[in-house]
Design a protein with these regions (language model features):
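OB-fold/S1-family RNA-binding modules
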Residues: 2-74, 95-123, 150, 158, ...
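Short, acidic/hydrophobic/Gly-rich beta-strand patch recurrent on exposed beta strands
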Residues: 71-75, 80-84, 125-129, 162-166, ...
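Beta-strand/loop nucleic-acid-binding surfaces
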Residues: 78-98, 171-186, 254-264
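Solenoidal tandem-repeat scaffolds enriched in leucines and small polar residues
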Residues: 132-136, 141-213, 218
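Residue-level signal for secondary-structure boundary sites
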Residues: 134, 171, 220, 256, ...
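Intrinsically disordered, low-complexity segments enriched in Gly and acidic/Ser/Thr residues
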Residues: 240-248, 252-259, 268-269
Length: 332
């Protein structure tokens, strides 16, 4: 079966639905569409009720003042998110000011801490750090290595992709964990603002840090090879050039080898003819047909696992004579 190469524990559907609405926290941008959030901005009474309940709300930050307070138009009130309440680590000097400035024009989570009706319009005082502290505490307490969660890409660095693991709480996916196929930069695989899935790699309560991985959700060698047939001509991307041949990515977790060609460079899109697929050697042999126009953006990932929990994942096909590529998600 498709799951034979890895052990996956799926959460029962009813529990999953309950978890997603009440127990888990979603990346920023996920809350604005929720009816309860929209309803909170309908009247001052509804906003006060949301304040009393400590409900997570969300709106787009309209501007950042010279003092680095964020301002929001909540319809029935003006929202002010003071600088020290904009993100975890700001008050302590551990978080750079760009983390505040870059919220302008983006959905931002918060709770209401006070409402001043003496102003016109009324002023709602907000806090994002209260939300993030609560979310970070819950994530550190409840997540285990191998848990599959939603995330949103916030920015890309040469060493990896930073993602929002819930209400703006940051996490890192190292470049080596984005896919099995090697890439030059995370932008070869992901785009800023993209919604993705990820698996928890490590949970470090003492450092208040969670690291994630992505490649285990993108399928084993056999699962990816099953998408192709010998004799087909398909599109691929040149990933690396070696003296003995050119590695061409067919999917993020499947590459093949073609004969050397002087006109090829990493990142080029090409069409390739599939000469052979050899599970025993974990090899796909290709012939380059043509160089194609470059891709505008990375292809959205195809996930073979979309929820639940992974105990272990084995990329290498059964009976293959190559070194086994495997991830075992250990509880620290």
């Amino acid at each position: 079966s498709a799951l034979s190469a890895h052990i996956v524990r799926q959460t029962p559907k009813e529990a999953r639905l309950h978890m997603k609405t009440s127990e888990s926290y979603l990346p920023e941008g996920s809350y604005m569409v929720q009816p309860a959030v929209r309803q909170a901005f309908s009247t001052l009474g509804a906003l006060r009720q949301a304040q009393d309940e400590g409900r997570i709300l969300e709106a787009v930050a309209q501007r950042c003042t010279a003092a680095h307070d964020l301002l929001f138009d909540l319809g029935i009130a003006q929202g002010i998110l003071p600088r020290v309440s904009c993100a975890l680590g700001v008050a302590e000097g551990d978080t750079r000011e760009i983390a505040i400035l870059s919220r302008v024009g983006k959905p931002t989570c918060f709770v209401v801490t006070d409402i001043d009706e003496s102003t016109d319009p009324p002023t709602a005082w907000l806090s994002r750090t209260i939300v993030q502290q609560k979310v970070q505490d819950r994530l550190l307490d409840s997540l285990r290595p191998g848990d599959v969660i939603p995330a949103r890409v916030t920015h890309l660095e040469p060493f990896g992709a930073f993602v929002d693991a819930g209400c703006g709480v940051p996490s890192l996916i190292g470049i080596e964990n984005l896919s099995v196929s090697r890439i030059c930069h995370p932008s070869d695989r992901l785009t800023v603002g993209q919604s993705i899935l990820a698996a928890v790699r490590t949970v470090e309560p003492e450092n208040r840090r969670i690291s994630l991985t992505h490649r285990e959700l993108l399928g084993t060698w056999a699962q990816n090879a099953a998408l192709f047939s010998v004799g087909e001509t398909v599109r691929g991307v040149v990933r690396s050039i070696e003296p003995y041949g050119v590695f061409i990515e067919l999917t993020p977790n499947l590459s093949g080898l073609a004969e050397p060609r002087a006109d090829l460079r990493p990142g080029m899109a090409v069409s390739v003819y599939i000469k052979s697929i050899l599970p025993q050697r974990m090899k796909v042999k290709l012939t380059v047909i043509d160089v194609l126009a470059p891709y505008d953006a990375p292809t959205p990932p195809r996930y073979f696992i979309t929820d639940g929990h992974i105990e272990e994942w084995t990329y290498t096909p059964a009976g293959c004579d190559k070194k086994t590529v495997q991830t075992i998600f250990r509880q620290e």
